[in-house]
Amino acid sequence: DVPTFWSQAAQQGFKPKIVTIGKALLFPSVVDSLGARGNGLTSEIWWTPNHPFKSGLTGQSCQALADAYTKATKRPWTQPIGYQHALFEVAIDVLKHTKNPNDPKSVLAAITSTNYQSIVGPVNWTGKPVKNVSKTPLVAGQWQRKDGKFHLVIAENKTAPNIPVGGKLLPLS
């Protein structure tokens, strides 16, 4: 697991200039468990409260969804929240556009014709760029410690320039 690897890497004197870790850095609790060595780790970012999208179902902005989650659970937002919400958005949209919800072919036709603006951005299964695949925007981020807490900061948005950058990429500390 990442905490064990990162701890042992430090013990061995391994000090790379940059480290990118995917799924293991989704949650602030994992980064917190790394202590000071978590500062500066990078990861791809799928969704944050700063993304410019809104729910086609509820009209909520990304920030409003994250705030509602934090208020209801007393826990910080995490990237999967946007996708969990989008899952329901898209499912409801598909049902709205299905001619006969009891007919699998009708449901499939509604899915493959989906072109929906969701809280994670456009969900489009109409065949572009690849049939039955919908790509959502990814940006690069970095965990940066501020005021004693780790924050996931968008540091690069070249592949999705409509998503605002929140800070510069800093060297590992």
Regions inferred by a protein language model and the residue ranges of each:
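A short acidic, often aromatic-flanked loop/helix-cap motif at beta-alpha or helix-coil junctions
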Residues: T48-P52, P161-N162
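Intrinsically disordered, low-complexity boundary segments flanking structured domains
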Residues: F27-L34, A110, W125-P129
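Extracellular/periplasmic ligand-binding modules, especially the Venus flytrap/periplasmic-binding
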Residues: D1-A9, N50-S113
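Short, surface-exposed amphipathic charged segments that create phosphate/polyanion-binding patches used
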Residues: S33-G35, G56-S61, V139
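Short acidic (Asp/Glu) and glycine-rich catalytic loops that position anionic groups and cofactors
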Residues: I45-W46, F88-E89, Q117
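Solvent-exposed, acidic/polar segments of extracytosolic/periplasmic ligand-binding ectodomains
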Residues: T112-S173
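Extracellular/periplasmic bilobed ligand-binding domains
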Residues: D1-P49
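Acidic/polar loop patches that form or flank catalytic/metal-binding clefts of enzymes
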Residues: P16-T20, N102-K105, S118-V120
